[in-house]
């Protein structure tokens, strides 16, 4: 007997796959996706919502009487959405904002790896164009540049 209402946050392929898996679960009666995409609209109810807006997400989850909220993208996790849901007594699948920093900030992840002596590629955090240019000259190609 299906009885669960699930809210999936996000609009990408990962969230589509998560929502579809929930839709196929016989324990799930209703799947909602915020904001969703045209693909998720074929089997779930999409809600136009900024998934990084903690108050809006909590309000929607309460309004839907969601039994579970699944947070797909890293941006809402880093913004503290999972924390806000848990603080409101709503079950949530997703790490805390603090734990999400490992995925959300490459610089933070590099600091953690260095502190734990985990082997990783050399890196440099830069705050302006001059320091980026100096780092590129120092490392030489090939290199990877990421925005944090």
Tell me the role of every PLM-derived stretch.
Residues 1-98, 130:
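ATP-binding N-terminal substructure of ATP-dependent carboxylate-amine bond-forming enzymes
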């Amino acid at each position: 007997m299906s009885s669960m209402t699930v809210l999936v946050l996000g609009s990408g392929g990962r969230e589509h796959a998560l929502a579809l898996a929930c839709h196929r679960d016989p324990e799930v009666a209703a799947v909602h996706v915020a904001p969703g995409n045209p693909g998720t609209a074929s089997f779930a109810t999409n809600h136009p919502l900024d998934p990084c807006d903690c108050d809006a997400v909590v309000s929607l989850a309460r309004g839907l009487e969601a039994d579970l909220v699944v947070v797909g993208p890293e941006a809402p996790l880093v913004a503290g959405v999972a924390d806000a849901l848990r603080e409101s007594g709503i079950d949530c699948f997703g790490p805390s904002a603090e734990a999400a920093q490992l995925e959300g900030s490459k610089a933070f992840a590099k600091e953690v790896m260095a502190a734990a002596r985990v082997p990783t590629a050399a890196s440099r955090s830069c705050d302006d164009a001059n320091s980026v240019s100096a780092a590129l000259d120092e490392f030489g190609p090939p290199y990877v540049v990421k925005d944090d």
